Curated annotation (Swiss-Prot):
GO terms for molecular function: DNA binding; DNA-directed RNA polymerase activity; protein dimerization activity. It comes from the Eukaryota. It is found in: Plastid, Chloroplast. GO terms for cellular component: chloroplast; chloroplast nucleoid; chloroplast stroma; chloroplast thylakoid; DNA-directed RNA polymerase complex; mitochondrion; plastid. Transmembrane segments: none annotated. The N-terminal domain is essential for RNAP assembly and basal transcription, whereas the C-terminal domain is involved in interaction with transcriptional regulators and with upstream promoter elements. The gene is rpoA. Its main location: plastid. This is DNA-directed RNA polymerase subunit alpha. Its EC number is 2.7.7.6. Belongs to the RNA polymerase alpha chain family.
Length: 329
């Protein structure tokens, strides 16, 4: 029997930024490479890094607005060109950078006529606005407008489900994701057992972090996730067959989906920027969706139960699992 020698590169792994540009105040791009890697390692690192970039990095958002002038969130206020809903959507798009812990207060207090921009927000210390020119509202008459704001730092996304009509306070859907997109690709070189790989990683951010900062934070978060495995003691668990088996009842996808949308009053714009990577789905369900070109929450909710069941290796129980996860978010 003859064994082939497997040659492994002894070169030290190196990474570098090969492209970096700022398209606007709210769009940064960076392209990085890591090499040399053994066959299969680039995909392992690329998948883990992409999920960490999109789901593990914290961001800062405006999460609530309060004003005595606002009767309800779909009303119009005399002297203001935009509806309340449009103002809340504009506040949702304000990009902030901070090192906050917990919740902080901010304030807008202006007198018309004139334009209200992000520059008019009175911020707490350690919070800065990335683009002061972002539009909030237009006052067409000489009126006073004061809006109290809540600012939070978190990760992932938060879909607010209830309004506090008594104190004129209105929630704002928050997407705490400084990284807007991340992709990886692989270049293979060499022959046979000497085949190696180069990992290319592309990162787009909203300006609150540079791609390099995002890459550093994602790497640090992944390291922290794996550290406990270095100290774990080997344990053996014995479970009886079917000890934790659960019978899952059938639930019509359409009805629960309609109720979910009514309950959360979510907007398509928010769903469009929420990737299924952030839903913490089981790997098998996640892989089935990705193979069917379902990449965002909006893609997912645009499918009926019948559409999902037609996906190869997808089951009714998987539909219920997805709904259970969505309703807890």
């Amino acid at each position: 029997m003859v064994r082939e020698k497997v040659k492994v590169s002894t070169r030290t792994l190196q990474w570098k930024c090969v492209e970096s540009k700022r398209d606007s105040k709210r769009l940064y791009y960076g392209r990085f490479i890591l090499s040399p890697l053994m066959k299969g390692q680039a995909d392992t690192i690329g998948i883990a890094m992409r999920r960490a970039l999109l789901g593990e990095i914290e961001g800062t958002c405006i999460t609530r607005a309060k004003s005595e002038n606002i009767p309800h969130d779909y009303s119009n206020i005399a002297g203001i060109q935009e509806s309340v809903h449009e103002i809340l959507m504009n506040l949702n798009e304000i990009v902030l950078r901070s090192n906050l812990y917990g919740t902080r207060n901010a304030l807008i207090c202006v007198q018309g006529p004139g334009y209200i921009t992000a520059r008019d927000i009175i911020l707490p210390p350690a919070v800065e606005i990335i683009d002061n020119t972002q539009h909030i509202a237009t006052l067409t008459e000489p009126i006073d407008l004061c809006i109290e704001l809540k600012i939070e730092r978190n990760r992932g996304y938060s879909l607010k489900m209830s309004n506090n009509f008594e104190d004129r306070s209105y929630p704002i859907d928050a997407v705490f994701m400084p990284v807007e997109n991340a992709n990886h690709s692989i270049h293979s070189y060499g022959n046979g057992n000497e085949k190696q790989e180069i990992l290319f990683l592309e990162i787009w951010t909203n300006g609150s972090l540079t791609p390099k900062e995002a890459l550093h934070q994602a790497s640090r978060n992944l390291i922290n996730l794996f550290i406990p495995f270095l100290h774990v003691e080997e344990e053996t668990f014995y479970l009886e067959n079917n000890q934790h088996q659960v019978t899952l009842p059938f639930f019509p996808f359409h009805n629960r989906l309609v109720n979910l949308r009514k309950k959360k009053k979510t907007k398509e714009l928010a769903f469009q920027y929420i990737f299924i990577d952030q839903l913490e789905l089981p790997p098998r369900i996640y892989n089935c969706l990705k193979k069917s070109n379902i990449h965002t929450l909006l893609d997912l909710l645009n499918n009926s139960q019948e559409d999902l069941i037609k996906i190869e290796h997808f089951h009714v129980e998987d539909v219920k699992k997805i709904l259970d996860i969505l309703e807890k978010k």
